[in-house]
Amino acid sequence: MTSDDTVWPGAGRSIETLAALSPGQAEAVLALLDEAARVDGQPAVSEQGRLQLRGGEREGVRHLLLSAGDTLVGYAQLEDTDPVEAPAAELVVHPAHRGRGHGRALGTALLAATGKRLRAWAHGGHSAARHLAQVLGLTLFRELRQMRRPLAGLDLAEPKLPDGVTVRAFVPGQDDAAWLAVNAAAFAHHPEQGSLTQRDLDDRKAEPWFDPAGFFLAERDGELIGFHWTKVHAQEGIGEVYVLGVRPGAQGGGLGKALTTIGLRHLEAQGLPTAMLYVDADNKAAVSVYERLGFATHETDLMYRTES
């Protein structure tokens, strides 16, 4: 664990910036995140952010711990890995310690750490988060929709694969490199997904929810050209279209629709009542496809940024 600095923003607060968390610090942050999610009904930090709490230092990632006395009352994670966009942040204040300026203190520290170039998520678009963004001088520029549909009575036509295409399950270890390459190509315009590394993939394979039987690979002549990775949220009874991608050059032949259908049928067969997915609101074509498949917007995550 390395400590970059500690600042004292007043009101009995201290903010420590770390390149990595100790196991004890990670557990304390996870407990804070779980309590905030219980109260808010929405995680304040993404899956990627939670995975980055453990495993030591990660390139471009910093953790900000806000304490009042000896009590951890706030957390922010700053990720500076995009070669073009401003650093991205997620932050949360413990529900029992809100309304005391802690969120503003964290936001101000994030702006100072990034030279006032910042993007910040407000998961679920809660009013307090929107107000904080306004106070910090950030403006809305991205909306990420979570869409859902019932799986009961799913009535989808038999998937029609393009000529010469076969589908099989992912084999851990064997398919890692090929999948990372196709994922990078399919999401070259989307650094959050396209920049996933072997370490990121290994993190996910180590999670309890990982099941290669629900990770579908489409091949033509032995080459990977597309995939649909599903995820089961067992506690919530929800199946997710986790990642769906088609390699450039293989798009436009109906492979994406076929892979979507295959994944949804798999989730239905698990007895799950609901399917969900995430899609950018400005991706009108994808939103239209999912609406035709019976999905409707459930909630929206908002991203704000500085104007510089």
Curated annotation (Swiss-Prot):
Single GO molecular function = mycothiol synthase activity
Q: What is its EC number?
A: 2.3.1.189
UniProt catalytic activity: 1D-myo-inositol 2-(L-cysteinylamino)-2-deoxy-alpha-D-glucopyranoside + acetyl-CoA = mycothiol + CoA + H(+)
Keywords recorded for this protein, A-Z? Acyltransferase, Repeat, Transferase
Gene3D superfamilies per UniProt: 3.40.630.30
Instruction: Detail which positions bind acetyl-CoA 2.
Output: 244-246, 251-257
Gene Ontology biological process terms, A to Z:
mycothiol biosynthetic process
Name the Pfam families for this protein: Acetyltransf_1 (PF00583), Acetyltransf_7 (PF13508)
Q: Where does acetyl-CoA 1 bind?
A: 91-93
> What CDD domains would the database entry show?
NAT_SF (cd04301)
**Residues the record lists as binding 1D-myo-inositol 2-(L-cysteinylamino)-2-deoxy-alpha-D-glucopyranoside:** 47, 192, 231, 240, 278
Q: Which InterPro entries match?
A: Acyl_CoA_acyltransferase, Bact_Acetyltransf, GNAT_dom, Mycothiol_AcTrfase
Task: Give all residue intervals belonging to the N-acetyltransferase domain.
Answer: 16-152, 165-308
> What PROSITE patterns does its record include?
GNAT
Is Repeat one of the keywords UniProt gives this record? Answer: yes
Q: Which family does it belong to?
A: Belongs to the acetyltransferase family. MshD subfamily.
What is known about what this protein does? Catalyzes the transfer of acetyl from acetyl-CoA to desacetylmycothiol (Cys-GlcN-Ins) to form mycothiol.
Query: How is the subunit organization of this protein annotated in UniProt?
Result: Monomer.
- This chain belongs to which protein, by name? Mycothiol acetyltransferase
Q: What is the lineage of its organism?
A: Bacteria, Bacillati, Actinomycetota, Actinomycetes, Kitasatosporales
Q: Which gene encodes it?
A: mshD
